[in-house]
Swiss-Prot record:
Pfam family, one: Trigger_C
GO CC entries: cytoplasm
HAMAP family in UniProt: Trigger_factor_Tig
Catalytic activity from the UniProt record: [protein]-peptidylproline (omega=180) = [protein]-peptidylproline (omega=0)
Annotated GO MF terms: peptidyl-prolyl cis-trans isomerase activity; protein folding chaperone; ribosome binding
Region Disordered, residue ranges: 428-462
EC number, UniProt record: 5.2.1.8
NCBIfam families assigned: tig
Name of this protein: Trigger factor
Ranges of biased composition (kind: Basic and acidic residues): 428-437
PROSITE patterns according to UniProt: FKBP_PPIASE
Family to which this protein belongs: Belongs to the FKBP-type PPIase family. Tig subfamily.
Keywords: Cell cycle, Cell division, Chaperone, Cytoplasm, Isomerase, Rotamase
């Protein structure tokens, strides 16, 4: 087998591979001899079938297998002998093959670039930090109290936010319809639980009032027999109840499983603190990625760039069609937009390659402990359903593997942050949560590079 490099342009490599006819024939004879040792055919004892008959019956299939193996071996040899790291699957084209002649084909491959990393110790970053305001803790307590509110009877007329206890019978064309009758139903006015217009007509009513509620079922109503039809509900208001917020005290804390009010306040403060730490981490990571992007300008494989751009552009077009276009994009021509998003795609690919290379060189790996921690973080996103999340990952290997990429990236980012110089800066909660793409209140400009598009598909290495 002869392998010759015929093109080396940028990250593209192309090789010509020639497999001599005699080598193919030798492989053919070896394989046919192996078959002949065990094959049974009418009129012959096992292992005694003439080779000419074996070749006639099995030669075509065997040669197909031999050619496939020869192509794979040739492509592998071209890559291995050249010490290449392919960026994508090689493209193979058979240029010449006839029976009893040499096999010739080409192998075209894009390789990963040689990456010379910057000195991470020269990176200077500012990490915004914020203290949890007491007002946010108080707001969270008020919301918990609101969720645990009760109600008490009142003698006045009902208003939005009250609960009315009602009996009702719904009729269409004077005939009661299935599911349109209830007794002692508690309805919170303003909750939009019922069809549009129903609750509004019960505002200003007192207990023991009889009310005729006229409404029209929406065209898209789930029950097709009622969709779009006018209806009359005969309603009896049995009771009007005003909401009464739960007291913010130890009993409220106990209702959510904590010992006392101080414990509840601590839990709330810790939760908000974790959220602020997450925002701080996100902004620090973005600043790091900006610095890494500015500090590296190696070429990226064209196919990877094109694939990333196509994925982004497909999402941009889908968002535009759905009415979710980024307002900043509306005034730009398609050519301008494509240039912007291609620059974004190139940044993503370059950063992805850089982080992968840093991880490879420094032998950073995702351990089982990392995966377990990632699963627990996912589970915390679904309070009350944690066990279902755990079961999902236990039974779904593909989903489990999908956690590896973001976990790997975070470990590489942590590695680089350990080497960078970081200065902590106390900021207000409002400034911490401010979108970094917007100019800050003191006039500081956002980074002069393609922004992350709200409407575009998000990737970790932005």
């Amino acid at each position: 087998m002869q392998v010759t490099e015929i093109n080396a342009e940028g990250l593209k490599r192309e090789f010509k591979v020639v497999v001599p006819a005699q080598q193919l024939e030798t492989r053919m004879q070896d394989k046919l001899a192996e078959i002949a040792r065990t094959v049974a055919m009418p009129g012959f004892r096992p292992g005694k079938v003439p080779m000419t008959i074996v070749r006639k019956k099995y030669g075509g299939a065997v040669m197909g297998e031999i050619l496939e193996n020869a192509v794979n071996d040739g492509a592998g040899k071209a890559i291995t002998d050249g010490g290449l790291r392919p960026a994508m699957q090689p493209k193979i084209e058979i240029t010449k093959y006839e029976e009893n002649s040499d096999l010739e084909f080409t192998v075209a491959v894009e390789v990963l670039p040689e990456i010379k990393t910057m000195d991470f110790g020269t990176i200077n970053l500012v990490r915004d930090k914020a203290v949890v305001p007491d007002a946010e803790v108080d707001d969270a307590l008020a919301k918990i109290a609101e969720r645990n509110e009760t109600s008490e009877p009142v003698k006045r007329a009902s208003k939005s936010g009250d609960v009315v206890v009602i009996d009702f019978v719904g009729k269409v064309d004077g005939v009661a319809f299935p599911g349109g009758t209830a007794e002692g139903y508690s309805l919170k006015l303003g909750s939009n639980t019922f069809i549009p217009g129903f609750e509004d007509q019960l505002v200003g009513k007192k207990a023991e009032s009889d009310v005729e509620v006229n409404v029209t079922f929406p065209e898209g109503y789930g029950n097709e027999t009622l969709a779009g039809k006018p209806a009359l509900f005969e309603v009896k208001v049995k009771e009007v109840r005003a909401p009464k917020a739960a007291a913010v005290d130890d009993e409220l804390a106990k209702s959510v499983g904590l010992e006392n009010l101080d414990a509840l306040k601590t839990a709330i403060r810790d939760e908000i603190s974790r959220e602020l730490d997450g925002v701080s981490r996100m902004k620090l990571k973005r600043a790091l990625l900006d610095a890494l992007s500015d500090g590296h300008d190696f070429p990226v494989p064209p196919s990877m760039l094109e694939g990333e751009f196509e994925a982004i552009w497909k999402q941009v077009e889908a968002d535009k069609e759905a009415g979710r276009q980024d307002p900043a994009d509306a005034a730009k021509s398609e050519d301008e937009l494509k240039a912007d998003y291609r620059a974004l795609a190139e940044r993503r690919v370059r950063l992805g390659l850089l982080l992968a290379d840093v991880g490879r060189v420094n032998e950073i790996n995702v351990t089982q402990e990392d995966l377990n921690r990632g699963i627990m973080m996912e589970a915390r996103r679904y309070p009350g359903q944690e066990h279902l999340v755990l079961q999902y990952y236990q039974k779904n290997q593909e989903a489990l593997e999908s956690l590896r990429a973001p976990l790997y990236e975070e470990k590489v980012v942590d590695f680089i942050l350990e080497l960078a110089k970081i200065t902590d800066k106390e900021v207000s909660v409002e400034d911490l949560r401010k979108d970094p793409d917007e100019a800050s209140a003191d006039g500081e400009a956002a980074p002069a590079k393609p922004k992350k598009k709200a409407a575009a598909k998000k990737k970790a290495a932005e």
